[in-house]
Design a protein with these regions (language model features):
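Small beta-barrel nucleic-acid-binding modules, primarily SNase/OB-fold domains
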Residues: 1-178
Length: 178
């Protein structure tokens, strides 16, 4: 570390240092991992280096991969989460992905590793889990986000924080009949 950076650090206070943010920034990205229908890892170029960030699609919620064991419709939710996750995989790769297949993490990473498709993300704030909230787009003109596509086609519902829906029975049964 050079002497100028050391002096900068020594003079730092909570009042004179900005908090790191990606808010309102647009990036070209590549999806390298998908956890569920609204959570994935993307690579972006920042300061001439490639970084990976865990990101969550903003404004939506999808079924959980690991719902609480006490949930009455747990098995239905797990099946619906696979369908939602695979729909996101289909969107980010432009590949014919079987929505009902329970792909392993390794299989998903292999699909994403060979995929060369680049996506556009518009960043928001970081959530309570440290994930950057993003709108995900196919093109840089960001006409229609994947977030909205997932909602419009029944793979997600609108969600802006706070208490989540308790009863998803009709939502899950719709997904399980896709």
């Amino acid at each position: 570390m050079n002497e100028d950076n050391i002096k900068l650090l020594q003079s730092s206070t909570s009042d004179n240092v900005k908090k790191f943010s990606l808010c309102d920034k647009m990036f070209i990205s590549k999806c390298i991992s998908i956890y569920d229908g609204d959570s994935a890892t993307f690579c972006i170029v920042l300061h001439n280096q490639i970084y990976k960030f865990n990101m969550r699609l903003s404004g939506i919620d999808t079924p959980e991969m690991r719902p609480l064991k006490t949930k009455p419709n747990r098995d239905l939710e797990k099946k619906a989460s696979i369908i939602s996750r695979n729909k996101l995989l289909q969107l980010v790769t432009d590949q014919n992905i079987n929505l009902h297949t329970a792909y392993s993490k390794r299989e998903i990473k292999n699909i994403l590793n060979i995929n060369k498709k680049l996506l556009y993300i518009k960043c928001g704030k970081f959530d309570k889990y440290g994930r950057c909230l993003v709108k995900l787009y196919n093109t840089k003109d960001h006409i229609k986000s994947f977030n909205n596509i997932l909602v419009e086609n029944g793979y997600a519902y609108k969600y802006y924080g706070g208490k989540k829906k308790d009863d998803f029975t009709s939502y899950f049964s719709h997904l399980n009949h896709c």
